[in-house]
């Protein structure tokens, strides 16, 4: 899922 991947990247960027 692209949306899930994008959200995952956002979370990784946060941490």
Curated annotation (Swiss-Prot):
GO CC, alphabetical: extracellular space
Keyword Phosphoprotein set for record: yes
Source taxon at top rank: Eukaryota
GO function terms (MF aspect): endopeptidase activity; metalloendopeptidase activity; peptidase activity
Chain segments annotated as transmembrane: none
UniProt catalytic activity: Cleavage of the triple helix of collagen at about three-quarters of the length of the molecule from the N-terminus, at 775-Gly-|-Ile-776 in the alpha1(I) chain. Cleaves synthetic substrates and alpha-macroglobulins at bonds where P1' is a hydrophobic residue
GO terms under biological process: cellular response to alkaloid; cellular response to fluid shear stress; cellular response to interleukin-1; cellular response to iron(III) ion; cellular response to lipopolysaccharide; cellular response to peptide hormone stimulus; cellular response to tumor necrosis factor; cellular response to UV-A
EC number: 3.4.24.7
Cofactor binding summary note: Binds 4 Ca(2+) ions per subunit.
Compartments (UniProt record): Secreted, Extracellular space, Extracellular matrix
UniProt PTM: The N-terminus is blocked. Tyrosine phosphorylated in platelets by PKDCC/VLK.
Keyword annotations: Calcium, Collagen degradation, Extracellular matrix, Hydrolase, Metalloprotease, Phosphoprotein, Protease, Secreted, Zinc
Cofactor(s) recorded in Swiss-Prot or TrEMBL: Ca(2+); Zn(2+)
Enzyme class: hydrolase
Principal localisation: secreted
Functional note: Cleaves collagens of types I, II, and III at one site in the helical domain. Also cleaves collagens of types VII and X. May play a role in the deterioration of the heart wall extracellular matrix proteins during the onset of dilated cardiomyopathy.
Family assignment from sequence similarity: Belongs to the peptidase M10A family.
Record protein name field: Interstitial collagenase
Organism: Rattus norvegicus
Lineage summary: Eukaryota, Metazoa, Chordata, Craniata, Vertebrata
Gene name linked to the record: Mmp1
């Amino acid at each position: 899922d692209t949306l899930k991947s994008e959200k995952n990247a956002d979370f990784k960027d946060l941490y």
